[in-house]
C-alpha cells in the first residue's frame, strides 16, 4: 500500500509539531523552535481545527508556538512578529497573552528615581 505525498506531508508536519510540543514541555526552547519552524514550513496557517489523519483534528498554532519560543529566548522582536502572524490567522488567548508580555518586555524602562 502506497501513501500519497499529501499524506506523507501531513504526517511530517504533525510529527514536527508534536516534537516541538515535547521540547517546549522540557523547556528546550531552541529545539522546540526548530521543530515548530519545520512544521510551519509544511503547513503554514494557524487554525483551531487542522486535519491530521482521516477524521482526526488538532488545534494547530505553529506561529504562536514559535512566538512563545522566541519570547523564552528573549528574542522579543521575532516573538512579536510570529505572535502577530498567529493572531492574523486565528485569535487565541495564549497568543494575546504572550504578545502582551512581549510588548511589556519591549517597552522603554523608566530609570529609578
Regions found by a protein language model. Give the residues of each.
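Pro/Ala/Gly-rich low-complexity, hydrophilic intrinsically disordered segments
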Residues: 88-113
